[in-house]
Regions:
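Conserved catalytic core of nucleotide-sugar-dependent glycosyltransferases
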Residues: 2-14, 18-102, 119, 138-154, ...
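Short beta-strand-to-coil "C-cap" segments at the C-terminal boundary of structured domains/repeats
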Residues: 134-136
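Structural motif
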Residues: 130-132
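Catalytic donor-sugar/metal-binding loop of nucleotide-sugar-dependent glycosyltransferases
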Residues: 107-128
């Protein structure tokens, strides 16, 4: 893929335990470098999303931030192939998906030498969930974190996003 991929291709890690809104695949085509977008029904908050203000990613809302630079779900990002190719050349072909539970996404994205603020927010500035973690077992609805309703997130996408859950 890195050596023979078509120019302007986009890499997205789809998973069999997710449900996708078909509109997502049109959005993915817009990925120039790295794009980020919300994932529903994930973590204790029920949502993992970039926080967007004035069209820019300014932080993350996730049930487990830890010390991750990119606290995102595997289904919450896409990468333009040219970005992967450049990173691969810088690293002499040593791009990898690290296997450290909870850190795979962060470890992979850190190799790209891209900052979260430089990523493109998709899904109407991250105000629409187009990917859902769905599994076939019973669970109670995740409580909406009351912190998301505070002034800390005022003038961001989270108000619209949480109202849609």
């Amino acid at each position: 893929m890195l050596d023979h991929g078509q120019e302007d291709s986009v890499v997205f890690f789809a998973d069999d335990d997710n449900t996708y809104d078909l509109r997502l695949f049109n959005e993915l085509r817009l990925t120039n470098t790295l794009s980020l977008f919300p994932v529903g029904l994930v973590t204790k908050t029920g949502l993992s999303s970039p926080i967007v203000r004035e069209g820019k990613i300014v932080g993350f809302y996730d049930g487990w931030i830890s010390n991750r630079k990119f606290p995102v779900d595997m289904a919450g990002f896409a990468v333009n192939l040219s970005t992967l190719q450049k990173a691969s050349k810088r690293r002499k072909g040593r791009l990898a998906m690290p296997f450290t539970p909870g850190y795979e996404e962060d470890g992979f994205l850190r190799q790209l030498d891209v900052q979260p603020a430089d990523a493109q927010p998709l899904a109407s500035n991250c105000s629409i969930v187009m990917v859902w973690h769905t599994k076939t077992f019973y669970t109670s609805r995740a409580p909406v974190d009351n912190l998301a309703r505070t002034k800390k997130y005022k003038n961001s996408n989270l108000g619209i996003l949480l109202a849609s859950l």
